[in-house]
Amino acid sequence: MRRPSRAALVQALLARQQASARALEAAGAPAQPKAIEARLILLGERVAEAFHRRAMEALGPIIKRAMEREQGKRADAIDELAPEGSAIDRAMRSLESQAASVTIGVASAVDAASRDLDSWNAEEIARQISIPVDSVAPDPEALNEFRNSAVGLIKDISAEQHRRIKELVDEAQTTGMRVETLAKRLEDELGIAKRRARLIGRDQVLKANAKLTQDRMQAAGFKRYRWSSGTDARVRPMHRELDGQVFSWDDPPVTNP
């Protein structure tokens, strides 16, 4: 009787991981990577909400005064923000320092998430290839890469909010944008930042889990793997086309971002 190839074993491993995840979800308990993804998304969204709240506290009174002056004037009336120039400058300088202060605690939260992801991945790999979990070595390089990348990206959420809000306020002052329009666009900035937080959480956990799996499978002697794509709408067309194909860990396919 022929022994299954290593590629076939990897395919079976991935299939069992997916089945295990589906079973956990069906039972009402999210698979660990999904739970960790949700934690990072929530962390990023809280950073976005905290900075947005401070931005509205700083700029809200200025916008309110300008809107009161704007009421009853022609739709093309301009320069209602002009008298607020000094107040706007003070507000933006204050917000620049607050962009960093709202990210206090991000590093420790990401560190905890990375440890949980590493533990889950080690136990899952050990279970699927039937080896003691103690023999699955930790992967400090992959974890450090995950921590540094995730912390940097989540901290940049508020910094990017500050940049975008400053550009928006500068545009309003330069072009004579209606204050009502400025207020609406400032509110929209929170949604933009939260969408970025969701993208960061999903992308970082996906990459980290894939890297941990690759390193541990290679350490166990597996030289090739079978590409297995997800089934949801987020799967890129190129990745869907690769589903089921076998590749070497040392020579992965070139995919479009």
Located regions from the model:
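N-terminal leader/targeting and assembly helices and adjacent pre-domain segments
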Residues: 1-189
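Acidic, glycine-rich two-metal-ion catalytic cores of nucleic acid-processing enzymes
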Residues: 192-257
